[in-house]
Amino acid sequence: MASNLPLQLPAGVSDLLPPEAAALRQLEQRLLNCFRSWGYQEVMTPTFEFATTFQAGSPAGEEGALYKFIDRQGRVLALRPEMTAPIARLVATSLRRRELPLRLGYSARVFRYEEPQAGRRREFHQAGVELIGAGGVAGDVEIIALAVESLAQAGLEDFRLGLGQVAVTKGVLQDLALPPEAVAGIKSALASKDLVALERIYDEYHLEGERRRRLELLATIHGGREALEEARACFGRTAAAASLAELSRVWEALGAAGLEKWLFIDLGILRDFDYYTGIVFEGYVPGLGAPVCGGGRYDGLLAQFGYPCPATGFALGLERLLLARGETAPASLAGGYLVAGRDLAALLKRARELRSKGTAVVLDGESRSRQEAAARAAARGLNLEWIGE
């Protein structure tokens, strides 16, 4: 009888076959083990919550990326588009009496109704950490250092983390005293490195001389220690000076720890969400036009859940990490056994003995001969153990 069930998947989702599933699980465990070694404890939040949870701190345009639905009581729910807001809600409710700082880690599927990108579809996997209650330079340094180690543990060798400071951008824009629509346009252009859009804004709002130069530097400053020096020379007497000094202290601490070779300064990094308040960062690898890692400080977010508290963290996109590595784990059960024969009770007993030693075992009670079982074992990359005559 013909089936009327759909055989195709909706746009933006995909199945994971054994090689991809094995690679993702191995990567996930390596990252969770890395987080644990730094004292971060794993938490889990629901796949869906009230939509208002995810609207906290999110730009107006991001609300359209939510997968929303209505429950039987008429309340609007949504699939989680990221993990920071749910963990902020969890801390403000279930963990608010715990001693700070809290170090929390996670690995979870998230959902965004966006155009699919390289290594990120509408359903994708994130792993990350949140450091709750640690304000200032020490917390920023810890999180960035952990991000570097996480990327190394993920199997990447040629990666770089770009460091920015959204408060520098806010300070520069504050000094310019532009209308809100101009500020929004500048933020969007800086985030996308759209120099043409910036040129239009310069012309429209008659930004010239030193005012224009400061915006141009925000968009173009890029590099190491010399980039910081250039930024200090330009912004040292503006509202951005204190934030820039904080970024310099973070850079110096990370450099003293031997991490400078993985870092660069990019004041155009603003991240996707409005709740970032201080130092932000993104991780890149050659040949992949999207970040594999991103995060930063969001000191105002927990206050929206009734628990004012400084916080910082980051997330890694697992599919993007696998794409950057360009490889998958073997899906075979290499080193395992095919236990074959006609005596099913004997097969089960022997399989249990082997599994107790940590060996993967496939049962075969259908092969009619040792030769047939040997062919099946070879096709699966397994060792053969024949029981019987």
Swiss-Prot record:
Record flagged with keyword Amino-acid biosynthesis: yes
Entries under InterPro entries matching the protein: aa-tRNA-synth_II (IPR006195), aa-tRNA-synth_II/BPL/LPL (IPR045864), HisRS-like_core (IPR041715), HisRS/HisZ (IPR004516), HisZ (IPR004517)
Name of this chain's protein: ATP phosphoribosyltransferase regulatory subunit
UniProt keywords, alphabetically: Amino-acid biosynthesis, Cytoplasm, Histidine biosynthesis
Single GO BP term: histidyl-tRNA aminoacylation
Any one Gene Ontology cellular component term annotated for this protein: cytoplasm
Described function: Required for the first step of histidine biosynthesis. May allow the feedback regulation of ATP phosphoribosyltransferase activity by histidine.
Domain of life: Bacteria
Database matches in CDD domains: HisRS-like_core
Subunit (UniProt): Heteromultimer composed of HisG and HisZ subunits.
Family annotation (NCBIfam families): hisZ_biosyn_reg
Pathway, per record: Amino-acid biosynthesis; L-histidine biosynthesis; L-histidine from 5-phospho-alpha-D-ribose 1-diphosphate: step 1/9
Subcellular localization(s) per the UniProt record: Cytoplasm
Stated family: Belongs to the class-II aminoacyl-tRNA synthetase family. HisZ subfamily.
Pfam families xref list: tRNA-synt_His
Note: This function is generally fulfilled by the C-terminal part of HisG, which is missing in some bacteria such as this one.
Lineage of origin: Bacteria, Bacillati, Bacillota, Clostridia, Moorellales
GO terms assigned for molecular function: catalytic activity, acting on a protein; histidine-tRNA ligase activity; transferase activity
